[in-house]
Amino acid sequence: MRAEARGGLERFCSAGKGRGLRALRPFHVGDLLFSCPAYACVLTVGERGHHCECCFARKEGLSKCGRCKQAFYCDVECQKEDWPLHKLECSSMVVFGENWNPSETVRLTARILAKQKMHPERTPSEKLLAVREFESHLDKLDNEKKDLIQSDIAALHQFYSKHLEFPDHSSLVVLFAQVNCNGFTIEDEELSHLGSAIFPDVALMNHSCCPNVIVTYKGTLAEVRAVQEIHPGDEVFTSYIDLLYPTEDRNDRLRDSYFFTCECRECTTKDKDKAKVEIRKLSNPPQAEAIRDMVRYARNVIEEFRRAKHYKSPSELLEICELSQEKMSSVFEDSNVYMLHMMYQAMGVCLYMQDWEGALKYGQKIIKPYSKHYPVYSLNVASMWLKLGRLYMGLENKAAGEKALKKAIAIMEIAHGKDHPYISEIKQEIESH
């Protein structure tokens, strides 16, 4: 079957980038270019009981799977629809009990294998790009990444051998490599992780640090909307990474995860880098070497914190945030992205500890520089306004709360579309207060 065109869009060969997606007609800011159902998706373990395992709907009073008591559903329809995939895990979770711990990548890959068996022909998620056409970048993997794939394959065999037929070992290596660079994480309106999925047609889009579209989720459906004016013949670009950081950091991340260096306008001009790594205005300004050392320290502390999250207590994590901010503030302005990173982490710890005043204090410092560093329509900025609005509302400051929530809505109406359930929920929060 030939890849059919999606309305007003075509697959093409993009110079120096391989395959890409191109517009055949104009799209205006806020227009939906296309939507793509998940080829396969899996709800993250931590959200069980809060979201339906099948459609990812967030609601109270979900029904529990009677066998494993771990999966929750809206109703019998969702449970029935999910059964061919849930059965891969249901009895295994009961048998292994506490020892059932496949990674999310393994869980998603198991579902892809099951889907390929059940539905060998092309699916509605693959109008322009089929899963089997995904890039694997196998030749570029370092030993650490290869080892990770081997341990994922071992876990796949350990937890899924009863209900799945596996292809040969080398095909599994390719599949895991494909999932690693083509998978998506589904996030909610506050950018909390909900699950992982494969959206083949969305994966066709190439990356830019000044993207002209944004990807959002409605349940397990991915939606792609314009955040800049798009003209016929323009390539459609999304962003694969968090755009907060300076050019060198962004490209380190892109090379590590996706094996390319970006050459977009932002990366060639480095226009925003100076403001992103803002240095304190002192009568005796820091020397270039002191700045370089502090940037190195900042990158190290970000990595150290990422690892510490898995084993340190909230109060220890907060201490890392506070000490690192204190050290960096001798050279960096508060609007510096490395300072903002640690403030954001500190805010997250405060939210976890239900220290609402502490979280609000950090959020208030973050929001203005965020709005400057990120593109105009940014989910990071929208989710920060949303968190601030909800904190104000919870602390009985209705005027500030309403103002912040309306700022979030203004961005989300473009990024998520005016009819998104998240937006009606937020409007409801404003009215009910």
From Swiss-Prot:
Enzyme Commission number: 2.1.1.-, 2.1.1.354
Transcription listed as a keyword: yes
Main enzyme class: transferase
GO annotation, biological process: heart development; negative regulation of cell population proliferation; negative regulation of transcription by RNA polymerase II; peptidyl-lysine dimethylation; peptidyl-lysine monomethylation; regulation of DNA damage response, signal transduction by p53 class mediator
Residue ranges of every copy of the SET domain listed in the record: 7-241
InterPro entries named in the record: H3K4_H4K5_MeTrfase (IPR050869), SET_dom (IPR001214), SET_dom_sf (IPR046341), SMYD2_SET (IPR044419), TPR-like_helical_dom_sf (IPR011990), Znf_MYND (IPR002893)
Record keywords: Chromatin regulator, Cytoplasm, Metal-binding, Methyltransferase, Nucleus, Phosphoprotein, S-adenosyl-L-methionine, Transcription, Transcription regulation, Transferase, Zinc, Zinc-finger
Zinc finger (MYND-type): 52-90
Compartments in which it is found: Cytoplasm, Cytosol; Nucleus
Residues reported to bind Zn(2+) 1: 52, 55, 74, 78
Binding site for Zn(2+) 2: 65, 68, 86, 90
Disulfide-linked positions: none
Function of the molecule: Protein-lysine N-methyltransferase that methylates both histones and non-histone proteins, including p53/TP53 and RB1. Specifically trimethylates histone H3 'Lys-4' (H3K4me3) in vivo. The activity requires interaction with HSP90alpha. Shows even higher methyltransferase activity on p53/TP53. Monomethylates 'Lys-370' of p53/TP53, leading to decreased DNA-binding activity and subsequent transcriptional regulation activity of p53/TP53. Monomethylates RB1 at 'Lys-860'.
Summary of subunit composition and partner proteins: Interacts with RNA polymerase II and HELZ. Interacts with SIN3A and HDAC1. Interacts (via MYND-type zinc finger) with EPB41L3. Interacts (via SET domain) with p53/TP53. Interacts with RB1 and HSP90AA1.
Family statement: Belongs to the class V-like SAM-binding methyltransferase superfamily.
Protein name in the entry: N-lysine methyltransferase SMYD2
Lineage, opening ranks: Eukaryota, Metazoa, Chordata, Craniata, Vertebrata
